[in-house]
């Protein structure tokens, strides 16, 4: 765990955790992603502000800080399709084989509702300049159980010719 004092600096330890979270997202491992997001949320967010979308969005950006190696800075409330995606990661020009990552956050509605919103509001349409894969990531926080759930789907976007 990155908060333990084992002789390494905390930043290096956390960057390893962040790489593991990014790997879980890339591999489509929703269970592992949710578990790790929950740990970061618990460690970095005050219990006073815990049940709020901004706190969860900031948690995601902290958890995926290692993505800066491969992606532009995350864009909050990215205008796309018929609405605004909560967070979008666009790959750097030097990383053309990396997928775009679209993250939608929900409270007490289930991760499937987040994925449905991405599809129903046609968020991927605004990302059609990317001819590769788009990862749709839905993350939900259940206030009663205090559990995070995640659903990850792959979407292939074919750029207009």
Cite the ranges covered by each PLM segment.
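Generic hydrophobic alpha-helical segments
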Residues: 67, 127-128
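Short, conserved secondary-structure transition motifs
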Residues: 139-147
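Extended alpha-helical interface modules used as scaffolds for assembling large macromolecular complexes
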Residues: 1-114, 120-122, 133, 147-161
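Low-complexity, intrinsically disordered Gly/Pro/Thr-rich segments
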Residues: 122-126, 132-140
